[in-house]
Amino acid sequence: MNEQIGKSIEELRAYNKSLERSPEYQRILPEVMWEVNTQFVKEIIAQEERWLSYKVEEEPIEDDDPIIVEFFKTLRADLKAQDELRKKRIEEAKELLPTDPARAAELLSKLGSCHTLWALQKRILKEKYGITWYTPAELNPDVKFD
């Protein structure tokens, strides 16, 4: 059974390699990646803006333990600082998006983003071009990607 799965994966790898070398794929790839990166950036910006819509609690911290009070004050300050960095990254990405979506996507990428980008690429290739493409994660089930 495992040998059969291994053979199937090897066949899919060969298919992908052949596809990725084809002139047609090479011709459409820049357009596909432009769309992939644009959609990725728009999705991440929407997520980040939703996050920013939440406010850090400003009520006084009531506790008899000064260590706990200091911890929560520090936590609030850290959250506010992270929000400022988040706002700056969003603005930079919005500026880059019309002319360089790849750089905007790179700016907003984080651990695990490769899976989102691959899913978008797979969907766009299938829906727009009728091309079945397999992600590196699908072709390498024993490898952890991030």
For the regions a protein language model found, what residue spans apply to each?
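Short amphipathic alpha-helical heptad-repeat segments
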Residues: 2-12
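Extended, non-membrane alpha-helical segments enriched in charged/polar residues
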Residues: 10, 14-17, 34, 38
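Acidic, low-complexity, intrinsically disordered interaction modules
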Residues: 36-91, 98-128, 132-135
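Short acidic DE-rich linear segments
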Residues: 144-146
